[in-house]
Amino acid sequence: MNSQVLVSRPLAPQSVPAVSLPVQSAQVAQNTGPHSSSGLATAGFRTAKYLHEEWQQGNLTTFYQAFSDRDQSEKGRHESKQLVAETEARAQRSQADCTKSLGERLLDIHFWKSELSREIRDVGAETQLLVQQKVRLERALDATDIPFTIATDNLKCRDRRRGSELVRDDVEMQLLKEVDLIRNVQELLKRTLDQAAQQIRQNRDAKEALEMDYSDKAEAYEFDDKCGRYNNQSTDIQFHLNSSKYEDNTSTPESWAQYTHENIYKAERERMASINLRSLIDSILQDISEDLQAQFDAIAVDFEKRCRELEDAKQKLEMHLKKTLEEIGGQEKNIAALKQAINDKSPPLKVAQTRLHERSYRPNVELCRDHVQIRLVSEVGELTDSFDALKLKLEESEQSLRNLEDTRMSLEKDIANKANSIFIDREKCMTHRTRYPHGMKLLGYQ
């Protein structure tokens, strides 16, 4: 049986590969073990053969080195594969992000183009209207006396607004303008001609700036739209080594948006000034006794607009108050739930601590830091952390409830102030202004 096994095994190599032997230091260690030589000449020194323990140690060293090399190689292959996947995903993600950013940029440019186009139309239309008013102003009649009492009474009534509602809004500005017209109608008529001419020039300058900005954005839109269509299969893409460098004259997204915003703001400011000037011209083009009809109409519009703003703000405040009250109720329930949760954590903590306490009386070597002991300590820590988290959240919720109560009182105060302002503007001022005189003299064509 043993001979068959030996025959079936592969033959041992018949020769030893020729390799250079490592140079060993000429150190001879004493061999006092049972395998020492029996010759007298070598007594006290080991033979040239290795011990069996040394042979085993050498094999173990070789095995460990082979395992270490394989493990290091496998780790390197895994890291290489992971790096390839990460770089590919990063490249795709970066390109997708850039394409998305280009799309968002196109939306931004389109938005500002639309705003510029709208403002260009509005400024152009307003300029034409102002030119017509200037022609009427050149042949206007002297103004007449205006109902001074109504204007001053409106101002006095609106001074009784409370809190933050005591604001100098468009209505108040128009009323002050009306009073000033009564006192300075003759002088105002002479100054308005020059003012109208100046406003027309400013409107045209603002419109020119808007048109230049619109032209630049239209060109930029074409470039970004072209860039957004590029992909890895595009045939007209190539390397541009210096393309990633920033130009010295580039703008930031903030300054880019701010530039257009300022242009639109300036145009709107000039347009609003032009609207106000036309309203003023309408007033001074009237007969002296009835000159304020146009101003009356403008004030009526502003009053109505202001009342709508107040009512809209009041409705929104009432909506926020309703939601705040609902949130107060929800927060109160949340606080109750947190308190209950804190109370519910007491029994588990008592159980865990009691278990630890009882197990501390185990005798002698039985007082072992076993898995149960470690898990009980961990459980106490977890429950303590839960206690702390719940208490912290309870404090935050109680502070939130106090903040909600403060907000509720502030909302109720604002609602009352706005209701008072609506009463003053609609019931007091607008009702009083229904007594304003009307007639053909107010048309300003005589």
Curated annotation (Swiss-Prot):
Pfam families: Tektin. InterPro entries: Tektin-like, Tektins. Disulfide bonds: none annotated. GO terms for biological process: cilium assembly; cilium movement involved in cell motility. Residues 182-215, 297-346, 378-422 form a coiled coil. It comes from the Eukaryota. It is found in: Cytoplasm, Cytoskeleton, Cilium axoneme; Cell projection, Cilium, Flagellum. GO terms for cellular component: axonemal microtubule; microtubule cytoskeleton; nucleus; sperm flagellum. Keywords: Cell projection, Cilium, Cilium biogenesis/degradation, Coiled coil, Cytoplasm, Cytoskeleton, Flagellum. Its main location: cytoplasm. Microtubule inner protein (MIP) part of the dynein-decorated doublet microtubules (DMTs) in cilia and flagellar axoneme. Forms filamentous polymers in the walls of ciliary and flagellar microtubules. Contributes to normal sperm motility. Belongs to the tektin family. This is Tektin-4. It comes from Xenopus laevis (African clawed frog). The gene is tekt4.
